[in-house]
Amino acid sequence: MIQKMSPSLRRPSTRSSSGSSNIPQSPSVRSTSSFSNLTRNSIRSTSNSGSQSISASSTRSNSPLRSVSAKSDPFLHPGRIRIRRSDSINNNSRKNDTYTGSITVTIRPKPRSVGTSRDHVGLKSPRYSQPRSNSHHGSNTFVRDPWFITNDKTIVHEEIGEFKFDHVFASHCTNLEVYERTSKPMIDKLLMGFNATIFAYGMTGSGKTFTMSGNEQELGLIPLSVSYLFTNIMEQSMNGDKKFDVIISYLEIYNERIYDLLESGLEESGSRISTPSRLYMSKSNSNGLGVELKIRDDSQYGVKVIGLTERRCESSEELLRWIAVGDKSRKIGETDYNARSSRSHAIVLIRLTSTNVKNGTSRSSTLSLCDLAGSERATGQQERRKEGSFINKSLLALGTVISKLSADKMNSVGSNIPSPSASGSSSSSGNATNNGTSPSNHIPYRDSKLTRLLQPALSGDSIVTTICTVDTRNDAAAETMNTLRFASRAKNVALHVSKKSIISNGNNDGDKDRTIELLRRQLEEQRRMISELKNRSNIGEPLTKSSNESTYKDIKATGNDGDPNLALMRAENRVLKYKLENCEKLLDKDVVDLQDSEIMEIVEMLPFEVGTLLETKFQGLESQIRQYRKYTQKLEDKIMALEKSGHTAMSLTGCDGTEVIELQKMLERKDKMIEALQSAKRLRDRALKPLINTQQSPHPVVDNDK
């Protein structure tokens, strides 16, 4: 029995096909300014803001920027459009460097523009699906859809209940409206320095690819986002303070293998950044799928696909041209539910690097646009069955990761899954809750290539928005329920994202300023040392009075009139030169013949090698003794001269007593040196005593040796 329609479920008015003509025809940088003009000039017709019915959709404005559910939004001021972002973004907009919130989840019913194969057609209304034959009366009757939308945040099932999300679009909304709610705020965050991730999730044939890429009549989120990105780049580059680099990569995950969609693209000079590394690639498959790429951990990006082609783009047209090249290589096939079904997960990676021209610092952030393949039932075709199994496996792994990530928050706040009103659906809803609150702390990111690539985004390195596409028809109720369960869990995943760090390029004005400051500090330190040197009248170790006086004269002569650094270097060189001369005198071994006749006789008695070695050793010792004696005599003469002169007290006072102390230390070292040499001589005599006794003995051994 068909229930009586509520006011919110009345048949919507048909929409004019000419409404899509207002959509901008080109996503280039030159034409994207029309988007902001449309936003400023679009004025919706006023209506009663307290009305709870959406039957007024027949009087909606034809502006492509008008939100479908704007009339039911009590926060909108009448007379002008106000694009309201998700609550999680608005609540945390005060924090410029960090973002704290959750994954933004939006629901989009299957668009009417999406065609299907065989007898499946697009959704004709938000409440009714295709007509079916009535056997009793022989006429066609509409089968009512079990899902309907009450406002811009709620989607309701007749038996299960209602689901609330950040935003629920009407079935007749345009891609431009979806872009205004989802993608545009993410581009703003990208320009601020945050990583941003947008992915479409849903069953096959529900409109994911149409939402992300669009068609010839209606642009999708990817071209609209690219246009808005380059428009902001042009505006921020006009003052000359910043410059931007945009690099694109495009990959797909087909049967749990990663392939580069830009590798076989047309070569353009200077556009290719990196050549795929064969070290981390598998060999090309025999079926022409290209070279499989591998995922590796990366300190900067979390994970990185090794060998993925990167193309530098100067305009939105160039970037969209590369995306079109990748789309031609993407795996697409016909299924029971869709004439052109995506058989792989496709991810567009747009890396934006902004450089501050003044200080040379740069910041890189990445926009990830993911068009996931849809879950589907088993089919009779062997190839499609194999593809579907890999797709379902990766989506199951993604659901498991989302479930475990949302477990903590679901325990404290409660699941977003509504309580069923029928006993038949109680077990399914309860199982969903139990899966989301699994006590395990392990997050199985490595169960699939998809979750491995999304690991940095889901673990807090990116702001995430998901667009869950659903089919509200009765025969797709099970798949729609699974999608909404996934969306409910995703809404509970907490995010705490920080801006990407600023990187210094090394040869910028900031480093120059730091170098200048370092040199300035060194100069101040040298000036301070010179000032202390003038006050103390010495530098370093005062070896002699003449050296101190000459050093002071050099500094005095050049300290005021010349460069103070030059005076300091001259003084240091003089001290070092004096030290070097003394060391050379002490270490040089002269070749003066030995004067001790007894030692000479002993040396001649020994074998040639031993005698030569002993003679050389004695020569060195005698040379050192002579040098020490000369040095000691010089110091003694210096002391005697100071004592005899009448300026001894004045000299000592001028040197602050330091020279006397140093001279006394030198005398002590001299005494120790003499004592050490005497000790060495005693050891030598003790060592030579057996040889002398042997020489004086009448034993015939000595005569035989000779």
Curated annotation (Swiss-Prot):
The further comment given in this record reads: Present with 656 molecules/cell in log phase SD medium.
Highest taxon above the source species? Eukaryota
| Family membership noted in the UniProt record | Belongs to the TRAFAC class myosin-kinesin ATPase superfamily. Kinesin family.
Q: Give the UniProt entry's GO cellular component terms.
A: cortical microtubule plus-end; cytoplasm; cytoplasmic microtubule; kinesin complex; microtubule; mitochondrion; spindle pole body
Q: Name one Pfam family in it.
A: Kinesin
The family database entries (CDD domains) matched by this protein are listed as:
KISc_CENP_E
**What is said about its interaction partners and assembly?**
Might be dimeric.
List residues of the Kinesin motor domain.
Answer: 102-493
A GO BP annotation: cell division
A molecular function (GO) term: microtubule plus end polymerase
Where in the cell does this protein reside? Answer: Cytoplasm, Cytoskeleton
Protein name, as recorded? Kinesin-like protein KIP2
- Residue ranges annotated as compositionally biased, kind Low complexity, are 1-28, 36-63, 414-441
Q: By its UniProt entry, which SMART domains does this protein fall under? A: KISc
Q: Where is the composition biased (Polar residues)?
A: 127-139
Residue stretches in coiled coil: 507-541, 569-589, 612-689
Q: List the disulfide bonds.
A: none
UniProt: ATP binding residues: 202-209
Q: What is its main location?
A: cytoplasm
* Keywords noted in UniProt: ATP-binding, Cell cycle, Cell division, Coiled coil, Cytoplasm, Cytoskeleton, Microtubule, Mitosis, Motor protein, Nucleotide-binding
Question: Has the keyword Phosphoprotein been applied to this entry?
Answer: no
Q: Which PANTHER family match?
A: CENTROMERE PROTEIN E, KINESIN HEAVY CHAIN ISOFORM X1
Region listing for Disordered, in residue ranges: 1-139, 413-445
Q: What does this chain do?
A: Required for assembly of the mitotic spindle.
